[in-house]
Amino acid sequence: MSKITTIGLDLAKHVFHVVCCDGRGKLVSKRMLKRRQVLTFFAALPPCRIGMEACAGAHYWARQLQARGHEVILIPAQYVKAYVRGNKNDYNDALAISEAVSCPQMRCVGVKTPEQQDLQALHRLRERCVQMRTGLCNQIRGLVGEYGLVCPKGVAILRRQIPVWLEDGENGLSELFRRLLSQSYAQLQSLDAHIAFYTEELERQGRQNTVCQRLQTIPGFGPIAASVFYSQVGNGQAYRRGRDAAAAIGLVPRQHSSGAKQTLLGISKRGDRYLRSLLVHGARAVVSRAAGKRDRLSLWINRLRERRGFNRTVVALANKLARIGWAVLARNTAYQAQRAA
């Protein structure tokens, strides 16, 4: 039997499909495994390259297989699709993965550590609660508007106004609607408590985690931005340079070029929208406070703002902050502001 060098593993909840290929890419064997058989099967194999789609559970299986001596490559699902031939089935998917993982130019996803996944879970839960609170506030505004009651923008103002509406017996609210509004107010308070818990936990992790502490030496990086950047980028080894990290976050121009004509459009906005928004918010704060400062970064910001305006400067700085963040992670050092010569 030919030596197995590359394996395509199609992940699932209960039934996994494996395609084994030799060094020339020729199919050696294929089989179906139940969940309890996966680790036993790979433990009996010599070290080889295993490709998987970067989907649910991929980071767990990648860590387990790496611990057994294998090289694991996680590939975005959209890149695997180009290699699928024939009908859609799990064996064809696994074969496509084995071919994609053999491409030298394939863009891969870094394997997350449990610590990174913990931070990511914190951010996802907090983000969900924030979205739920925003939706609830908008719904409350719409409902009370049908009774002739309006409120200025802002969660804090609405939070103060609801008790006033409930206590006012002359505003035309029915008894039933008062009970509904009171229930919605209790739900809003519960969401506030959940968001406060997640925010406090993120800030605590930012203070205790040494990597997050280094990231917070960068202008525009607070505990929340530092923790989400670390959870997504890891140690930075998944990218060759800072520009690649910024491109993965979607902070580089989208290109539509042909021949000798180079056309650059707005930023691509690919990758994680949540991380990109935090970098832009942090950059906006830095740009707003750069006037009068004499370090090299602030001077660059002020010159660019004069030429290109505020918003373009914010996005350009967000790109630069992503590159600086990658350098801090990849070189295991803290950011040091440089004075102008």
For each predicted feature, which ranges?
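A detector of single, family-specific signature residues
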Residues: 1-341
